[in-house]
């Protein structure tokens, strides 16, 4: 049977292909088997499908796609994980993601939580391994599993983060320490929004739009309550950013730097010719990255400062995956130290919280019992002197804390992260979905949501230069990068150009610049997370695909380069809009 016929028969039979640790297998539906009647021995004749269409089922390429589309679709390993004999390591890393961390004095398999933290586990922010869920009006409660929101507190004059909180501000602390933010005093409110088309398509169909607003009063901030003041403590703004899906990030890591550079050069050319009006000229000019403008990602703390093309987070704050959101987040979300990060994630200043916490009488009273659960006077005499204020300050600002996560656990986490597959596209050969695909391109969506990329040799880079130091580890002396699953020469379908753009939305993202979010797999968000909404865009304001599209041309304070595509969407018939939406949900 031809490959194109195989895909057609699988789709028409409503079959399920399960991708697991040990490989894959296909379960054809009873309907297909029953169609072979006793008096009719002829094989069913599947619909012929264009091979180029059939290939689009492999969103992550042949090495990075899973064909499970149930509630655990985002949790599957790539075929490479099994091929490289990494299945056990993958499962160990999976536990690091799913299971909660506990404080040192509570015992347990995963100790080291705190002294400050955002969540006790990664799964809190990534329900079903996907995008965070929008939260209802009311108190900002990060104890709710599924609340993937992170607060962004910044100076509106220059878009710089305030220095008296962490870049990802913590709402929890292990006693006797006090949380940097009192979440009970933070309020989330949703507001209805009416766009310049009165939320109405030309054919009369209407839609709804909403946006979030967060109130963070001064009295919710610990260091301000303790007496800290600077120019921003009375002049700051707050935005929400949601976590994104983590499946397939290893495949994005396998895209060569020069391919991403070529895409930026292409869009710079469009900017120079007047086809688009917004472009990050401070980062990229005349076909070159502007190192002086901070365009490259570098790590000069653990690494050697080598420059790398940025590719992760909305702000494109990270480069290669081995030193990006996942490997960094499991440290700063939990404050669990490891051999390459023997220090705490506090405020951006590094000493403001430590200064005020060390002077807090209640913290001082509980610190001696706390520190005995962490280390000993023999290992760290500077935490056990007669001056408790100095002890607390020394502990909070130390760069030589005990490693609470083993090297083997960290490696397992990294293998798991880079080993997550992308769910296959669904029903992509359906006539209506193919019509939606053509419309997606015709009206201009594909200009930013670039459909496909080709991975390179996938020489894994780690700006962190992590090498296993534990002599008892089976990986002793090996680098983290050398142990990772790899995805060379794959055609993948993420639907992103890996470039930042501006959408000019009400209560927009900090700076206004946001990387084009990959669309692959997002249609399964509600299935995998249990959310009542599709939770699209950076702050989950869009409850469905239509809302997400229309926000691309809200044009608050500027005109988005996506406006022409949105206008094209508006002018489609109701049936055509439905087909385009079905396509977006199918990929």
What kind of region is each of these model predictions?
Residues 68-69, 75-89, 98-409:
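Extracytoplasmic redox metalloprotein regions
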Residues 3-4, 26, 30-57:
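Bacterial Sec-dependent N-terminal signal peptides
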Residues 19-20:
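Glycine-biased, low-complexity coil/linker segments
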Residues 350-422, 432-438, 514-587:
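Extracellular low-complexity, Gly/Ser/Thr-rich intrinsically disordered linkers
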Residues 117-129, 246, 413, 436, ...:
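The canonical Cys-X-X-Cys-His
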Residues 48-77, 90, 94:
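N-terminal regions that are enriched for targeting/export leaders
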Residues 230-255, 259, 263-266, 485-558:
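An acidic, gly/pro-interrupted, aromatic-rich
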Residues 72-113, 402, 409-441, 455-456, ...:
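Electrostatic cytochrome c docking/interface patches
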């Amino acid at each position: 049977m031809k490959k194109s016929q195989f895909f057609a028969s699988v789709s028409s039979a409503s079959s399920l292909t399960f991708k697991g640790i040990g490989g894959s297998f296909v379960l054809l539906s009873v309907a297909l088997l029953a169609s072979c009647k006793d008096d009719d021995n002829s094989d069913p004749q599947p619909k012929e499908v264009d091979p180029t269409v059939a290939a689009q089922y492999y969103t992550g390429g042949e090495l990075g796609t899973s064909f499970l589309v149930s509630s655990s679709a985002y949790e599957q390993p790539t075929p490479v994980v099994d091929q490289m004999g990494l299945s056990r390591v993958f499962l160990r890393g999976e536990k690091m993601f799913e299971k909660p961390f506990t404080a040192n004095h509570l015992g347990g398999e995963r100790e080291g939580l705190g002294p400050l933290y955002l969540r006790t586990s990664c799964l809190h922010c990534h329900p079903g391994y996907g995008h965070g869920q929008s939260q209802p009006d009311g108190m900002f409660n990060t104890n709710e599993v599924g609340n993937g929101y992170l607060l962004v507190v910044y100076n509106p004059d220059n878009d710089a983060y305030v220095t008296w909180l962490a870049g990802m501000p913590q709402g929890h602390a292990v006693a006797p320490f006090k949380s940097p933010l009192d979440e009970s005093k933070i309020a989330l409110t949703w507001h209805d929004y009416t766009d310049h088309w009165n939320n109405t398509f030309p054919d009369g169909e209407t839609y709804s739009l909403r946006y979030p607003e967060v109130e963070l009063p001064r009295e919710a901030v610990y260091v301000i309550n303790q007496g800290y003041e600077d120019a921003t403590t009375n002049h700051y703004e707050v935005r929400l950013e949601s976590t994104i899906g983590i499946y397939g990030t290893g495949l994005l890591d396998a895209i060569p730097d020069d391919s991403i550079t070529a895409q930026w050069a292409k869009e710079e050319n469009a900017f120079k010719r007047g086809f688009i009006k917004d472009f990050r000229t401070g980062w990229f000019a005349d076909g070159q990255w502007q190192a002086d403008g901070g365009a490259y990602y570098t790590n000069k703390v653990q690494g050697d400062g080598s420059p790398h093309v940025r590719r992760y987070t909305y702000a494109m704050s990270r480069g290669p995956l081995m030193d990006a959101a996942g490997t960094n987040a499991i440290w700063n979300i939990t404050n669990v130290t490891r051999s390459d990060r023997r220090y705490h994630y506090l405020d951006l200043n590094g000493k403001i919280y430590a200064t005020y916490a060390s002077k807090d009488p209640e913290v001082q009273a509980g610190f001696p019992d706390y520190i005995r659960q962490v280390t000993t006077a023999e290992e760290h005499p500077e935490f056990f002197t007669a001056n408790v204020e100095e002890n607390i300050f020394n502990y909070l600002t130390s760069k030589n804390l005990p490693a609470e996560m083993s090297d083997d656990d960290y490696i397992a986490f990294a293998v798991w992260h880079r080993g997550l597959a992308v769910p296959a596209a669904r029903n992509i050969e359906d006539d209506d979905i193919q019509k939606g695909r053509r419309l997606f391109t015709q009206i201009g969506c594909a200009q930013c949501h670039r459909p496909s990329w080709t991975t390179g040799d996938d020489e894994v880079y780690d700006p962190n230069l992590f090498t296993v130091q534990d002599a008892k580890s089976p990986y002793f002396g090996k680098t983290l990068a050398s142990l990772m699953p790899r995805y060379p020469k794959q055609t993948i379908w993420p639907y992103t150009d890996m470039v930042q753009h501006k959408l000019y939305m009400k209560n927009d993202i900090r700076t206004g610049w946001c990387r084009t979010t990959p669309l692959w797999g997002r249609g399964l968000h509600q299935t995998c997370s249990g959310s009542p909404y599709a939770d699209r865009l950076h702050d989950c304001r869009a409850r469905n695909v239509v809302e997400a599209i229309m926000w691309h041309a809200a044009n608050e304070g500027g005109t988005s380069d996506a406006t022409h595509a949105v206008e094209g969407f508006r002018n489609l018939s109701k049936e055509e809009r439905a087909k385009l939406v079905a396509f977006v949900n199918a990929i």
